[in-house]
Amino acid sequence: WLRDAKVEADRDARMQRINAGMQQLAGANHLSIVADKDLVAEVADLTEWPVPVLCEFAADYLRLPEEVIRITLKNHQRCFITHDADGRTSNRFFAVANIDSKDPSKVAEGNARVVNARLADAAFYFDRDPQESLEARVEKLNHIVFQEGLGTVGDQVMRLRSFMLDNAAAMGAQADVAQRAAYLCKSDLTTGLVREFPELQGTMGGTYALSGGETKDVAHAIALHYQGLPKDMDTAYGTRAVAAARGIAIAEAMDKLLGYFHLGRIPTASADPYALRRAAISLIHLLGSDATHIGLQPVEMSLGELIKQSSKQWNQQRITTSISADIQKQVRDFIVERLLGLSASLNCSRTAIEAAMESSTARPLYQLLEVARLLSDFSQSETGQAVAAANKRIANILKKSDAVQAGVNPDLFGEEAERKLFDALKAAEAAMPEQAGGMLTTLAGLREPVDRFFDDVMVMAEDDAVRVNRLALLTRLRALFLKLADISRL
């Protein structure tokens, strides 16, 4: 009886009505529907008896960027985009009525009227905005507050540009492209179209940059810097643009974290109004990917160095009191906390990440995660467990002893196991490769002489010179392991 009353209670059935109705009308009019499962589900939740209606906006508005049309139809009107027989965006679209109208043309006219009005506003700004170049608009950013106490968006742009000038190579980016894109990347905030459609930030910056004479690399970097790394390299952009966009996104996320932590706006368990957790997670994904699958060089900068370089930009501007060492540590700890929470999705264990982070080598994050993944697998092996146990024993012995500054004196060896371990240690030091997998293989090869040492040698000998010499041997051994990680944490 509900269906007799034009009410479909089954959500899946409502979704089926929407899809089937659109497909029927699209086929009859030589159109294809741009698939959007999320929008179908949303519209199904907004209607009781959904009836697709084919509508049409003025063809002149097809000159607008496709993203403007998409946002107008989908985001603002919950309508579906279509393509014509040649695969181009069509000026015909589907609205979904909540009634089986006796006169569908009236429904179509009403929807078209609303869409045409919004597109008319967009066209007005689209035609007017380019009268002022993005470079000329940079000065206007000095009148947009970034955050009270942190200066303006103009100040932020200068920090981003300076960061990219200093660090483009470490970001895997080309300096001229990266610094120019950073300089212009927020200028579209002053345009009428972005004020009307905030979702177009970046997208319109790229469009206006291209029409204003900037290179494709600069324009595409501006358009992409909000979006993160693509899953696959889109040939429409290219590596120079994507690398520059990645560098700007990294600089912006770190800039934001340092600024808000300086103000004391640190997220709590229940509130994160400035999306700082999201900024930290974005940083982890950008820094942690080696990106070779999309043709990019990885980011060759450690987390600590990134924090230092970003703090330098803040401190040079003197907008605030300097970003202190304590604030820098808080930001690092905050990012590391997020990193540990993501361990499973990064295909390694939490303890392996902690072990890798205790290395004496300051590695870029993508290399640190490579080490953590190796350690995760290694810790599951019998050799890995034995080496970890030996490292725990070494760490505990050294922790309870005074720091040893002396070198190892072979003349003080009283046991063959000492000499065997020392010879194996020297050989490992000489052969130690730079690549993490090779380092782990070399260190794992020390298992037998280390085990024999602990079986045959009393480290804490009564003779002071012998005891200190054995502690020096363990100190040197531990230092070698720490070049890779603190395996005692496994």
For the regions a language model picked out, list residue spans one by one.
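Amphipathic alpha-helical "coupling" segments that flank catalytic cores
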Residues: 1-490
